[in-house]
Amino acid sequence: MKTKIRFASLALSLMFASGAALADMKIGVSMSQFDDTWLTYLRESMDTKAKSYPDGVQLQFEDARSDVVRQLSQVESFVSQKVDAIVVNPVDTAATKKITEAAVKAGIPLVYVNRRPDDLNLPKGVVTVASNDLEAGQMQMQYLAEKMGGKGDIVILLGDLANNSTTNRTKGVKEVLTKYPNIKIEQEQSGIWSRDKGMTLVNDWLTQGRKFDAVVSNNDEMAIGAAMALQQAGVAKGSVLIAGVDGTPDGLNAVKKGSLLVSVFQDAKGQADGSIDTAVKMAKNEPVESAVWVPYRLITLQNVDTFK
């Protein structure tokens, strides 16, 4: 009889170990910045995913405000709170070493989301959930190059230079350009992901008398800013082709209206679901992939209505 009781107690304790772990699970999330359109969709989707679990999973969101030191401090705070897992959207993809070390030393699972650290040799217990930014640049530029007939001048609106999404999207663009020697880069400058900055840069280029046939933007926000600058300058819609990345609601609307020729859909829900699901599995000691890739998809006038 005592043996049966012991087995029953063991089974009950195991049940509580797994069930209560989910009900009481707390995940610390450090976002590079709250004041970013696409990252807002990512954060909201994370929250929705966490609430979708039967018992719910508690997320503690922190805003790093584009400050590397602040982000590290947030991660160290998560460690001291003994959270069950940590999710980080890094401010600077070249400055993640101390974040990784802090989580690994504490034995807390770490998931990097949306932005993959520059150091690809991540230790056990550290996973990335992202999309291949090289493909995004390749997809937007290939579509543009074909629409341009393989010739003309382009300007490139770069994102934050501390972010390897900027580097890789632009690298993808330039890889495609090697097949089109008659397409030249007239200008490339950083608009730091901002609609206002994208608008200012394009307005400045127009004021300087620079001529270009297309604008290749690392994201939709800067692309929309470019479209606004061209419109204000009296340039006919569609005479300068514009490509973005993200597929935000504003970006989708711009494609539908013809302000943008093309965008590339970055799946905020897919990355959010993947990051939280992976963090939960790691906290429960379940096996996960070392890298989870969420595919990009091309957005054109012909298929824009299929995206939400």
Where are these regions (language model features)?
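A residue-level marker of the well-folded mature domains of exported/periplasmic proteins
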Residues: 21-308
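Gram-negative bacterial Sec-dependent N-terminal signal peptides
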Residues: 1-23
